[in-house]
Amino acid sequence: LQASAEKSLDSHLTKIESRPGFQHPKKSVHQRGKATRYLQGAVVSLDNSSGAILAMVGGRSFGDSAFNRVYRARRQVGSTFKPFVYANAFETTGLLPGAYVNDDPIRLSHNGGPVWSPQNSDGTFTGLQPSAIGLIRSRNTMSIRVGQLGGINNVRELARTLKFGEIPDSPVIYLGAFETTPMTVTSAMSIFATK
């Protein structure tokens, strides 16, 4: 599995580098000993039962960069956090996947902060939809409403329990607007496979 993960990561990133218009340095022209500026990535695979690492690739070439992106690269979590927002609401409120949630525009602020009007990625709003659709289609406005239903403190506590660390006390967390590592996200996701 380790060799496959290494090969797959390099293959996918090489494909991206070969796209027309790709303007950044490429691994194929990198000179050893110089700063590593070419496209990087990370892969981690865990055994859901034991948490054992099955494969881990911290970058494209350890010889060029010893920085392990699996453990050390903090990136915005984004929509990968939405399953935890929904899981919290399912557990704490009894929300069911078939329960309808509004996907219309929303305006909100938190603790007297500025008003925020998030959009859906496709720029549309679809009215009442089953909550499962909100998760499956990653609808931002529905995810915020589901997060509010479950409660920001409950979502933050779940995130702490799953070792996401400190996350903002703001509704932006419902959309994953905070940073953590690939290892943290992968470890947290294993709860869905074991429940």
Where are these regions (language model features)?
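Glycine- and acidic
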Residues: 64-72, 140, 167-173
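Conserved catalytic neighborhood of penicillin-recognizing serine enzymes
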Residues: 49, 95-155, 170, 194
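Proteins synthesized as precursors that undergo proteolytic processing into mature forms
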Residues: 90, 97-98, 162-167
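Short glycine/serine- and small hydrophobic-enriched flexible loop segments
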Residues: 10, 87-94, 148, 187-194
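Active-site-proximal helix/loop microenvironment
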Residues: 161-195
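Short, solvent-exposed alpha-helical surface patches in non-cytosolic proteins
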Residues: 4, 8, 84, 132, ...
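Short linear capping/connector segments at secondary-structure termini
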Residues: 24-28, 105, 169-175
